Amino acid sequence: MPRGGMDDHWPSSDDQGHEPKEPEQLRKLFIGGLSFETTDDSLREHFEQWGKLTDCVVMRDPQTKRSRGFGFVTYSCVEEVDASMSARPHKVDGRVVEPKRAVSREDSARPGAHLTVKKIFVGGIKEDTEEYHLRDYFEGYGKIETIEVMEDRQSGKKRGFAFVTFDDHDTVDKIVVQKYHTINLHNCEVKKALSKQEMQTASAQRGRGGGGSNFMGRGGNYGGGDGGGGGNFGRGGGFGNRGGYGGGGGRGGGYGGGGDGYNGFGGDGGNYGGGPGYGGRGYGGSPGYGNQGGGYGGGGGGGGAGGGGYDGYNEGGNFGGGNYNDFGSYGGQQQSNYGPMKAGNFSGRSTGGSGGSSSGPYGGGYGSGGGGGGGGGGSYGGRRF
C-alpha cells in the first residue's frame, strides 16, 4: 500500500536535520521503460507514494534534452525501496515501467551485472555449512525455490560454493548489492549466477565491435573456452583472464563441475581468479574495464570497443547519448528536482582515451561514449521505448 497520497509531502533528509543512515546506493532505484513524456515531477509524483525521495531524475540527452527513457529515484531508507518494489507493477504516465535496484559502479564492470536473474552464487562457504544454514539465512530476503550445495562427484566432499534460486529477481538484486554476507558464522561472497547462455548475452552486449575477445580483453572470452590453462574460474583463470566461464579450453572444467572449481572456490586459483584483476588484461588494452574508467557500456579507450547495455534499453546510445556513467552522477549541467547534482559525466561522449569519468553519485557507464579509438556502443542495450 502506498504510504501517502499523491499530494502528501515527504520531507527531505535536510528537513529532518540529518542525512539518511543507509548508503545511497542501497536506497536507489533505476527506472527503465519510461514514456518520453515523463518528467522529473511526474516520476516523483508516482514513486513518492511509497516514501520520501531524496532525489528523482529523468535522464536526458545533453544536446536535445529529450528523455533517454530511463531515470533514477532515491528514497530516504531501504524500507521504502522495499515497499516500492513490493508494489510492482508500476505505471507512470500510462506506461508500465521497469524498476530495479541500481547497481554500483564497481559491480557494473562485472559481467552480467545488469542482467535480470533469479539465481545467486554463494562462494566461500565452509565444510560445516549445510543447506539449512543457507535456507535460514536467505529466506529472510524472499521466497526460495531451490538450494544446491555443490559437492565433488567422486568424493562427496563439499566444494565450498552453492546456488540459491528465488522466485523474484528483485530478491537477487537486493542480496547482491550487499556483496558480503555472514552465513553460519562465516563470511561469504554472493554474486548473480549466470547460465552459459546468459553470459553469452552479457558478452554480446558488451563486446560489439573493437578488438579483444568478447569483453575480457585478450584470451578471455568469458564463456568461450578460449585459452590454454585455467578454464572456468579455476586455476590461473579468474573470470576470463584465460579460459572461460564454462568454456572448454585448458585445465579448468566447466560451470560448477569438474576441474578446479567455480570462480576460484574449491580449487587452487585464488579467490575470483588469481590473475591480474577481474578479467585479466582489461577491456580495451589497459588494466581494468574501459581503459581508464569507461563504465558499463562506456567506451574503452586504446582500441577497445564501446558497446554494452543494461538489459537492453535503447540500443546504440539512445539519441546519440553521452557517457552516462553508471550509478553515480548524472552531473554536468543536468538538474534534478533537488537542484544541480554533483559533478559527474553526463555530457556527451568522452574524449582522449578515458571512456568516462568516475565522479559523482551516478558515475559509471549507462551510456555510450568511448574516447581514444574506443567505439561508441550501446546505452542500455537493445530495445527502444
From Swiss-Prot:
Domain RRM: 27-110, 118-206
Signal peptide: none
Gene Ontology molecular function: mRNA 3'-UTR binding
Pfam families the record matches: RRM_1
Amino acid composition bias (Gly residues), ranges on this chain: 207-218, 350-385
Keywords annotated in UniProt: Nucleus, Repeat, Ribonucleoprotein, RNA-binding
Source taxon at top rank: Eukaryota
Record localization: Nucleus
Record SMART domains: RRM (SM00360)
UniProt name for this protein: Heterogeneous nuclear ribonucleoprotein A3 homolog 2
Originating species: Xenopus laevis
